[in-house]
UniProtKB/Swiss-Prot annotation:
It holds the Pfam family Asp. The lineage of its organism: Eukaryota, Fungi, Dikarya, Ascomycota, Pezizomycotina. Monomer. One of its GO terms (molecular function) is aspartic-type endopeptidase activity. This is Penicillopepsin-2.
């Protein structure tokens, strides 16, 4: 089952109290969205190649035939005991609390809604337009992912509250049709995109993201992400929390011309081997780290037993392998991804073969720095510049 492009956990968090910070004569806000762990009631199936296919198609990359075939065959694993929690983000949308996936790789706020049939909506919290909501006549939205999961529907202007900060009016994309893959994941009720508004998919006119709507209310027009492995993390809006990282932040300029948080890393290191620059996107909505073929080959060339497995839809490694760290150089800063994060998940429950957390970007032309990378870093998404700040997590 594939939910957006994030599978192992539904990354998000529990909105907590927003602290209003006076700045001059105006009141500005900062707030933190804390992730909240929720026990999984039963083992959860994960379509590993489907997850990979979704990440590729999200950016318009061709999905290799072997990956597509593996995704359609439904290769799955059950959630290991060590990973038996999910992290959910309650967000107030039009007066209803929904669990949304925060995604820096997209710019839509779409939700399960009362427009869905009972068979599509059972087990989900549903958006019901508030009494002050306005339906945008003639407006629509539609998304399709690499595993053929899809959703579409109508557009409303309504209010959205995260951490006590209210976006109003905010475009809310209400699902009126949804595929079975989304229906099956009872824990997630939609997505809150945090990329640039220029890539919002609403037709005939794109709409602004939640962040763009509220950034004028924030103490600083930024948010910072601390994702964790097997533990709750946070999203900080309007401020940088110096207690969450060590040393100093290193900034990289962002090229937002394509609507993404795109930056260029100066190089990479794998053990004693090093390589050149990598252009990529910081994406909390993608689980894997997708890199150019030569970098992927460099990495798995140092792992005994690693192989490109067409039946699995990607590179696999022995689950018992001690994988090397992968280091991304940004200026003078070395962002280290521990090898333990790259040994991602067993192909099947009890399998001794694991799916690799680093996979090919399939000739996409840029890399995707997903959660495998982000879980090792404190990352600041700063609209001023724009720029990205990186530091090791405390």
């Amino acid at each position: 089952m594939v939910v957006f492009s994030k599978i192992t956990v539904v990354l998000a968090g529990l909105a907590t109290v927003a602290s209003a910070v006076p700045t001059g004569t105006s009141r500005k806000s900062t707030f933190t969205v804390n992730q909240k762990a929720r026990p999984v009631a039963q083992a959860k199936a994960i379509n590993l190649p489907g997850m990979y296919a979704s990440a590729l198609s999200k950016y318009g990359a061709a999905v290799p035939a072997s990956v597509k075939a593996a995704a359609e065959s439904g290769t799955a694993v059950t959630t290991p005991e060590a990973n038996d929690v999910e992290y959910l983000t309650p967000v107030n949308v039009g007066g209803t609390t929904l669990n949304l996936d925060f995604d820096t790789g997209s710019a839509d706020l779409w939700v399960f809604s009362s427009e869905l049939s009972s068979s599509e909506s059972t087990g989900h919290s549903l958006y019901k337009p508030s009494s002050n909501a306005t339906k945008l006549a003639g407006y629509s939205w539609s998304i399709t992912y690499g595993d053929q999961s899809s959703a579409s529907g109508d557009v409303y202007k309504d209010f959205v509250v995260v951490g006590g900060v209210k976006a109003s009016p905010q475009a809310v994309e209400a699902a009126s049709q949804i595929s079975q893959q989304f229906v099956n994941d009872k824990n997630n009720d939609g997505l809150l995109g945090l990329a640039f508004s220029s890539i919002n998919t609403v037709k005939p006119k794109s709409q602004t993201t939640f962040f763009d709507t509220v950034k004028g209310q924030l103490d600083s027009p930024l948010f910072a992400v601390t994702l964790k492995h097997n533990a709750p993390g946070t999203y900080d809006f309007g401020f940088v929390d110096k207690n969450k990282y060590t040393g100093s932040l290193t900034y990289a300029q962002v090229d937002s011309s394509q609507g993404f948080w795109s930056f260029t890393a100066d190089g990479y290191k794998i053990g004693s081997k090093s390589g050149g620059s990598i252009q990529g996107i910081a994406d909390t909505g993608t689980t894997l780290l997708l890199l150019p073929d030569n970098v992927v080959s460099d990495y798995y060339g140092q792992v005994s037993g690693a192989q490109q497995d067409s039946s699995a839809g990607g590179y696999t490694v022995p689950c018992s392998a001690q994988l090397p760290d992968f280091t991304v150089t940004i200026g003078s800063y070395n962002a280290v991804v521990p090898g333990s994060l790259i040994n991602y998940a067993p192909l099947q429950s009890g399998s001794s073969t694991c799916f690799g957390g680093i996979q090919s970007n399939s000739g996409l032309g840029f890399s995707i720095f997903g959660d495998i990378f982000l879980k090792s870093q404190y990352v600041v998404f700063d609209a001023n510049g724009p720029r990205l700040g990186f530091a090791p997590q405390a």
